[in-house]
């Protein structure tokens, strides 16, 4: 087949896809739910590659036929350039699909929002960010669960932990879209507590982790854990549960603390807290093992300081600016209502270009 796609790469994919198809058709596989999920997820990841390859093969066959016809009848010659362009476009698309990618792109995520400098205004902005991600998830049919939240006096979030899951096995999951959101987000607006109408600057931080499919994928020694239980609390710290159902898990070797209080029972809260802990430990282990991953993660929140910003939300000018790529748009209300695709597409494009340049 003409084009730049490496034959060995696509041959490997074809063989893997055929093998997965056989596995998934075997009823015995589904006796092991974890293995079935992994096979299904990988099968879904390969689906766009297989579809693009089929289109490319069909277009190449059409091109070969058109060239043969044009050799005998010049009236067919006009079709050749069009088909050549189609083959080149599909070949490039297939090459992009076969390029090295983030192994977590199909994963769900744990997302944390933390208020920073700015007191109540920062907490209110943190809740605006959390709502932005919830609305974005809803637009994509994803499932969102607020695992834990500490609410400020005015109803903002001092901190909140969200679990965001995609609607099924997909090549590009939640992580592929939201992985660039980690960092310090700065807001410029007139706070509700400001009586003089002056614009203030405050900040909130976002941390995001790919969530392992199974807690067992991450090695966690029970003796390294301190588990505390307490009553779930509502707005302003008021108790909303008469039993000690909320769970706080401290991983003693790293000092990582995870809390969960939104499930119905202590057992459910512990299970969800363990999932969050596994995600954070997995991220920490990958940082330690991979210098590139470490450098990237350092761009997330170290200290929620207004000077370390990835993005600014300017209310007086209705403008959002992503400082990493120079992206600007004047639709702040829409962005905060979850219309993030244009921005996330631009960030993804910049990341792909950087990866290709580094090869």
Curated annotation (Swiss-Prot):
It is found in: Cytoplasm. InterPro entries: PCRF (IPR005139), Pep_chain_release_fac_I (IPR000352), Pep_chain_release_fac_I_sf (IPR045853), Prokaryotic/Mito_RF (IPR050057), RF-1 (IPR004373). Its main location: cytoplasm. The modification N5-methylglutamine is found at residue 238. GO terms for cellular component: cytoplasm. It comes from the Bacteria. Pfam families: PCRF, RF-1. Methylated by PrmC. Methylation increases the termination efficiency of RF1. Gene3D superfamilies: 3.30.160.20, 3.30.70.1660, 6.10.140.1950. GO terms for molecular function: translation release factor activity, codon specific. Peptide chain release factor 1 directs the termination of translation in response to the peptide chain termination codons UAG and UAA. This is Peptide chain release factor 1. It comes from Rhodococcus jostii (strain RHA1).
